[in-house]
Amino acid sequence: MADIQEQISKLCAEATFDAEGEFLLVNVPDEKWHSLAKALKEQLHFDVLSALVGVDWKESLGCMYYLTNSETHEMIHVKVATTNRETPRLHTVSDVWAVANFQEREVYDFFGIVFINHPDMRRFFLRTDWVGYPLRKDYDDSDATNPLRLTPEENEDDTFALVEDEKGETKRVNKKVFGADEYVINIGPQHPSTHGVMRYRASIDGEVVKKVDIVSGYIHRGIEKMCESLTYQQTLLYTERMDYMAAFMNRHCTCLCIEKALGIEVPHRAELIRMMMDELMRLHSHLLSYGCLTMDQGATTAFFYPFREREYIYDIFDKTCGARMSMSYDCIGGVVRDVHPDFVQDVRNFCDVLEKRIPEYHQLFSGNVIALGRMKDVGILDKEDCLNYAITGPSARAAGLHCDLRKTKPYSLYNEVEFDEIVLENGDSYDRYMVRLKEMEQSINILRQCCDMMDKEEGNEYCAKVPKLIKLPAGHWYQEVEASRGIFGVYIESDGNAKPFQKPYRMHFQSPCFNLVGVVDLTCKNNLIADLITVTASLDFVIPDIDR
């Protein structure tokens, strides 16, 4: 990191550094941020904006940018802030990393920071008539400010950009989302193929898609806001209610972040159990993805097959956790109880069953002429697009990107098992579909190795000794795991205050699905409107994980 710090100092003399934390922290004045961002990407190869977190530090408002080098997998974070709370402004980096487009809109929605030169400064989650910015510390949350509205939200066809000229002067430029001559159709929010309350507004020429505008936030629950009034143990509950098909991974990630902050060493058996639950959850998710993708193309028979196998997983969860969904099993320090006596044998039996069933899935659908016609060379997302939009998980590996955290930055006990990272190269809907089926085989392989490790485990310690009241020191931490749909990240900032009990000063969940929905326009453009549903199904995003 010392070498990186030296190079950044040469690029930006005004930058200051803090190298004491897990990642190098770079403090940059806003007026220097855009030029430094371009240099970080083009010269130092920090080509992925992994997370963008808005924070209200009371004396200032700003953002934490977590940047990753896709070749070395090194990470740094950059802090950019403004002391102007009345009209807070920062320069956009959406032209440097395309993923910042939606992420900066999210920050504007919740903190009111307007990003100079951002092309589309609309709210993303909240209604257009919402008053105030909920994640600011001075937010007025009274009913009088935002009374319950029972009227439908009107179409938002107007947006604006704050444009800066060569002299450094800014002016507001009003824009239209769609042109007057564009033919726009509406899909959702209540549509069976959106797999949740998501709305697409698509501009079409004949049957060819020219632009897709995402309208989200229909099930936004303010999870990050709620976490600011909860204990750290209580926040775990909400992590399972974002991507419910990655419930174990999300909760695992949050526990890892808190454990890292406290220096807690988790027992080997507990971490092994966590990893097994994560892989069962991954299988659970990929099975559902297969069923939904096939159903969206009319293959009703193929839709029912994976639900048969998912029942096995539900039964395993139910025996140990006492619930089929929202298991609340991982806890800070380990897991809440030891596994059921039948757990290891049940997992072995399930692996044997699923291994025999996967060829049936291929026979039912993979070679179907309609499936090939609808998915081959359709919805292409190449490697550069994945880096630019911070796409991870199966969708990125289908484009040839080696980004599996279990391999690149092993956490938990993934360095103790052997498995292959499935990487294809076409980046189309078909390869995204195939990656998930092949990853199921690797998860079976991991689970079998874990079962053998469980047989050799000595003792039954499933949780470390953890105080009832969790108190984090002042600071900030960031943790990532490989969830079902890509990299899931948790940002925690603590002010060290523990009166009357300690609650997070700021908690942010970096959702892989939020990035995935950001490429819907890119992947659907110039494809048939009939293929929009297939393309989005192959991206496999979950709406609650986007809205949070």
Where do the language-model regions lie?
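Terminal low-complexity/charged segments
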Residues: 1-208, 285, 367, 371-378, ...
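Active-site bordering "gate/hinge" segments
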Residues: 128, 161-195, 203-548
